[in-house]
């Protein structure tokens, strides 16, 4: 059995080596994401594990099939996969997931530090200003919290929020309740999980108009949910009181890269970052030691199970 791994993180190497000894397979490894230039690495491989691609569409499936690949595991929740194309080329696809606690806890942290003006506190400390008059914060447990989405991360976040005394309402994608009422009632609106229908929940001018003045928005799901020009207008007009985002539209090529010697080409990101009530983190909510080990472990186990003629709970059918 031979497996190919693309977009491999340094964090995954030790765990992958242990799994290789456990399941006894050969491996081909690349730090680069899968592309036409390095596709030949997967020739004669029984399965392929990918991370970091924006989309895996018709051409990708055609290329994989041309090298004899029958089984594919995707380790990145941000990657859009054309499952119908995969079926046309007889490729079975699994998606590794990480435990919900990482994103749920990080989302809570973002909401807390945003409300307690921690960004401003850090700035002031850099110039030895330890006054606190400008740092008066708010208590999250006194806010009406709205959580958008479904799945384990949403459930776990709701559990944690309720545990500290928050009043929480969840608007799932299959709910029939009024989204307008949800917007009007929520003082803090949190997006912790990628949505199947992001257009329905897109935060644009119309959506913001239905929200409370000074609404707190927290997004650890996907940059595509927020219409950035509308978000900028909302911050400038103070319609948005606090904005915290671990994701950003157009983040690929910036987040998870060292850009200390570069000028950022994403002007919206650079502009928003300078506001004292805006917190932007580099898509790190998932990034824990346990999450990284779990991603590669579930990826390998899924491929091995399918190659050996079994089933995987992570297969997308």
Segments (PLM) and residue ranges:
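Rossmann-like dinucleotide/phosphate-binding beta-alpha-beta segment
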Residues: 133-213
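Phosphate/diphosphate ligand-binding glycine-rich loop within oxidoreductases
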Residues: 44-122
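Short glycine-/small-residue-rich Rossmann-like dinucleotide-binding loops
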Residues: 52-53, 192-195, 221-222, 248-249
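Rossmann-fold NAD(P) dinucleotide-binding segment
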Residues: 56-68, 198-217
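Rossmann-like dinucleotide-binding domain for NAD(H)/NADP(H)
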Residues: 214, 223-317
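Oxidoreductase and adenylate-handling cofactor-binding alpha/beta cores
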Residues: 104-123, 162-166, 300-305, 309-310
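N-terminal glycine-/charge-rich "phosphate-binding" loop or analogous flexible N-terminal tail
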Residues: 1-45, 255
């Amino acid at each position: 059995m031979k497996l190919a791994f693309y977009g491999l993180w340094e964090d995954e190497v030790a765990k992958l080596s242990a799994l290789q000894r456990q399941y006894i397979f050969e491996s081909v490894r690349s730090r680069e994401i899968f592309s036409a230039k390095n596709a030949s690495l997967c020739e004669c491989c029984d399965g392929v594990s990918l991370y970091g691609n924006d989309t895996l569409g018709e051409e990708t499936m055609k290329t994989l099939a041309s090298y004899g690949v029958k089984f594919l595991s995707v380790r990145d929740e941000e990657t859009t996969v054309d499952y119908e194309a995969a079926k046309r080329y007889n490729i079975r696809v699994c998606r590794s997931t990480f435990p919900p606690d990482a994103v749920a806890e990080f989302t809570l942290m973002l909401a807390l530090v945003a409300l307690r003006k921690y960004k401003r506190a850090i700035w002031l400390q850099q110039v030895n200003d330890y006054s606190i008059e400008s740092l008066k914060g708010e208590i999250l447990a006194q806010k009406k919290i709205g959580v958008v989405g479904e799945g384990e991360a949403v459930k776990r976040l709701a559990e944690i929020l309720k545990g500290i005394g928050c009043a929480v309402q969840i608007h799932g994608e299959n709910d029939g309740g009024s989204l307008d009422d949800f917007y009007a009632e929520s003082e803090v609106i949190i997006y912790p999980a990628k949505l199947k229908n992001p257009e329905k929940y897109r935060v644009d001018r119309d959506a913001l108009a239905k929200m409370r003045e000074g609404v707190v928005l927290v997004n650890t799901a996907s940059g595509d949910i927020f219409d950035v020009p509308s978000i900028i207008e909302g911050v400038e007009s103070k319609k948005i009181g606090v904005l915290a985002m671990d994701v950003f539209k157009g983040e690929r090529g910036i987040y998870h890269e060292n850009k200390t010697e570069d000028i950022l080409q994403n002007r919206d990101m650079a502009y928003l970052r300078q506001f004292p009530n805006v917190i932007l983190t580099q898509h790190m909510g998932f990034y824990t030691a346990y999450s990284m080990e779990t991603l590669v472990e579930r990826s390998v186990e899924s491929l091995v199970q399918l190659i050996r003629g079994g089933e995987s709970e992570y297969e997308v059918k």
